Regions:
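Adenosyl-5′-phosphate
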Residues: 1-4, 10, 23-24, 43, ...
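Residues that scaffold the ATP/ADP-binding catalytic core of kinase and kinase-like folds
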Residues: 91, 172, 380-383, 531-532
Length: 606
């Protein structure tokens, strides 16, 4: 895992690159790569790359970046890991390619020179990278299918800048810091800033599963090479049928293979362990490979003796699979002391991520460089309540479209219900307005504020401009375009393309990189998705998490299998008891406003 950045002065009237800006941007990402730093400038100073390295595969200096091809005609700055790089390297060697390192970075560079953008679907891993191709005077950028690794860019019409973090681009000093109403409104609606927006007008995020090029004419529009909705639609259309045994075998084999790939490393790999099925399955499958595995669990004093305390069951799983286990306890005082750093590391405002920040901190304090996480299991195997609730809501409220008298009566009641917050939740008044489509029902279920509410937070003018620029319903609809085909696959596409991508994965990235830790997610893998999607879809509404938990040869402890799902939460209400505005009516909304007001570089004056 690393931090990458670069500048391209593509327009003839643009000044040569300021090497100091390149360095400032790079050094703003020091925690992403404490092991090495590098800079490359083209002879005409029209192109420059920076890199901060966290050494995981081929830890020698010869694998440092930016990496220049043997021919001198291509330069790469790369962030992430390619788990199948060894097989790809063997394939290239059979075609006559020679290598100077044993790194996955060089495999990407050699593949690009040979195959160009056509290589992207062959890369199994998490990545964001940029390649300067001197043969065509073109900058090529790409991001992994799920967007596990971030990539932000800014274009002022003459100069193109990119980096792994928003705050790194800002640190360079070459872009405007004007806030983007769309990014702010997006955060208030969703609890995160929806891709491709950021909190700044000048900075955008390259969408997951896409690439783009920058030529002398400037940047092209991002081009998608992976569509999750398409993969799910194709799996539905295949109409495959399986016996229970066949289905279980397919899922077990595919998940086991993904875990094996995610263990590829030249440094030790650990794993986060909770009381849930996802992390337990990952740990069980990792230990099947025979490696000595360290695990860590985060516990909170406030949860001791309650259902939310995951430490006791995590310890049971650790004993079951023979891991070297540590339990780290987080107190309110430790939280308050670390909160300013957490908010500064956040990069973009997020409703979540504090839990990830502290478990990554615990792993880093144990000396880890790489950790496995069970993130992604709920989206892939239907573990969230949204898989049941959203189709049910649509069936119920969809009837109102055919009952105009009832619909009109409900519509007339909306203003009164919205004002009477003592009797009605903020969302209740707008149920009929939104719950007649998948995008509307998803916004109601996962949303923080609703479009009708945000003016009370930021004022009428910003709300109007932000909503217009954001187009939240169209943004959500894109996640299920093309139509994945069934209620299950529509919700899976929504959860994976929105909540997982722009919330969970982004939070894992900033939280882990703040502690120079690489977090890998074996259940978030495009190769795995293609393998298991037909089998999961064929379950006809049953919970796929049961088959995920059945994947290990040595079953998960019965207490974990029987435990009611609770999610990985932190006791924020107790920790922020000193702040009456937050705790007086605690929930997602007050915490979101706290983050927006108290955040680091992105703090917004309201």
């Amino acid at each position: 895992m690393c931090g990458i950045n670069g500048i391209v002065s593509f327009h003839a009237s643009a000044p040569p690159i300021d090497a100091d800006e390149l360095t400032r941007t790079r050094e703003a990402m020091r925690s992403r790569g404490p092991d090495a730093a590098g800079t490359w400038l083209s002879p005409d100073r029209r192109v420059g790359f920076g890199h901060r390295r966290l050494s995981i595969i081929d830890v020698s200096e010869r694998a440092n970046q930016p990496m220049v091809s043997r021919e001198g005609d291509a330069v790469l700055t790369f962030n992430g890991e390619i788990y199948n790089y060894a097989a790809l390297r063997e394939e290239l060697e059979r075609e006559g390619e020679r290598f100077d390192t044993t790194s996955d970075t060089e495999v990407v560079l050699r593949m690009y020179r040979k195959r160009g953008a056509a290589m992207l679907p062959q890369l199994r891993g998490m990545f964001a990278f940029a390649i300067w191709d001197a043969r065509t005077s073109t900058l090529f950028l790409a991001r992994d299918p799920y967007g596990i690794k971030p990539l932000y860019y800014a274009n002022d019409g003459k100069t193109f800048r990119f980096a792994s973090q928003v705050k790194a681009i800002l640190a360079g000093g070459g872009v405007s810091t004007s806030r983007d109403p769309a990014g702010i409104i997006g955060f208030l609606l969703r609890g995160h800033v929806p891709e491709p927006f950021t909190i700044y007008e000048a900075i955008r995020e390259l969408p997951a599963g896409s690439s783009m090029v920058v030529t002398r004419d400037g940047p092209s529009a991002p081009r998608s090479y992976f569509s999750l909705a398409t993969v799910l639609r194709d799996a539905v259309n295949a109409r495959r049928r399986y016996s229970d045994g066949e289905r279980a075998e397919i899922i077990a084999r595919a998940v086991r293979e993904s875990v094996r790939y995610h263990l590829v490393s030249d440094v030790p790999v650990g794993a986060f362990l909770s009381a849930g099925r996802d992390s337990g399955t990952i740990v069980a499958l990792a230990t099947e490979t025979g490696i000595p595995l360290q695990t860590v669990t985060l516990r909170f004093e406030e949860y001791a003796g309650t259902h939310k305390d995951e430490a006791p069951l995590a310890a049971v799983a650790a004993r079951e699979y023979g891991t070297i286990h540590q339990t780290q306890t987080l107190s309110a005082e430790m939280f308050r002391r670390s909160l300013p750093h957490a908010l500064e590391a956040m990069d973009q405002p997020s409703l979540d991520g504090i839990n990830s920040y502290f478990v990554c901190k615990a792993a880093a304090e144990l000396g880890w460089k790489v950790a496995l996480s069970g993130t992604g299991g709920d989206e892939l195997f239907g573990g969230y309540s949204t898989f049941r609730i959203i189709p049910r809501v649509l069936r119920t409220f969809g009837l109102f479209r055919h009952l105009p008298t009832v619909a009109k009566a409900f519509t007339r009641m909306q203003p009164r219900m919205a004002r009477n917050r003592a009797r009605f939740s903020p969302k209740t008044a707008y149920t009929l307005k939104y719950c007649t489509s998948y995008e509307g029902a998803y916004l109601m279920k996962r949303g923080l504020f609703l479009p009708d509410d945000v003016s009370s937070v930021v004022g009428e003018e910003m709300a109007r401009e932000g909503l217009q620029r954001l187009g939240i319903m169209e943004l959500i609809r894109e996640a299920i375009t093309p139509d994945p085909g069934t209620p299950f696959t529509r919700v899976a596409a929504l959860e994976s393309s929105l909540f997982l991508r722009s919330q969970l994965l982004r939070d894992i990235d900033w939280a882990s990189m703040a502690h120079s830790l690489e977090v890998r997610v074996p259940l978030v893998d495009a190769f795995l998705l293609r393998e298991v999607a037909p089998a999961v879809i064929s379950m006809a509404g049953r919970n796929g998490k049961e088959l995920l938990a059945a994947a290990p040869k040595q079953p998960l402890p019965a207490a974990i299998l029987e435990r009611k799902k609770s999610g990985f939460t932190v006791p924020l209400r107790d920790w922020l008891s000193h702040d009456r505005d937050v705790t007086k009516q605690f929930g997602g909304r007050p915490w979101a406003l706290y983050v927006l007001d108290a955040g680091g570089h992105f703090a917004v004056a309201r």
